[in-house]
Amino acid sequence: MLDVQTITVSIDRDWRAVYEFCRTPEGFAKWASGLGGLERGATGWSARTPEGVTIPVRFLEANAQGVLDHWLSPPGAAEIYLPMRVIANQAGCTVMFTLLRQPGMTDERFAADAAWVARDLARLKEMMEA
């Protein structure tokens, strides 16, 4: 089993509004810095990573449960599953992103990835509460 870390942020906005903002690739691109340069091509979506590599990205279909799971397909590597949820929390919501430590990932890289996700979720909070 892979090690996991779930990073959360509480947002003072109705969960449905946050979900609607995040559920499209265009919405993701506004706050998720790791998915910069999202483009729709003939075979689906792709993103340019911070390292400059273009990788295919799949997004879960729209749903009524606040599930925002997505998958990255780096060249020459196994597909990476990125589970994400938006849940109601009284008048606001909590966004949860579960980071799965990939095989061979160092402690330092796992910690850096978790910090990156936390920064992106803080950016999402800022945008949604503005």
Feature annotation, model-predicted:
Residues 1-39:
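Hydrophobic ligand-binding cavity/cleft-lining segments
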Residues 8-12, 58, 85:
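Generic structural detector for well-ordered beta-strands
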Residues 11-13, 49, 72, 101:
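Short beta-strand-to-loop capping motifs
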Residues 17-22, 28, 59, 70, ...:
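Hydrophobic pocket/interface hotspot
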Residues 20-33, 64, 115, 119-130:
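Short, intrinsically disordered, mixed-charge
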Residues 27-81, 89-90, 130:
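Glycine-rich portal/gate segments that line the openings of hydrophobic small-molecule binding cavities
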Residues 72-130:
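Beta-strand/loop substructures that line and gate deep hydrophobic ligand-binding cavities in soluble
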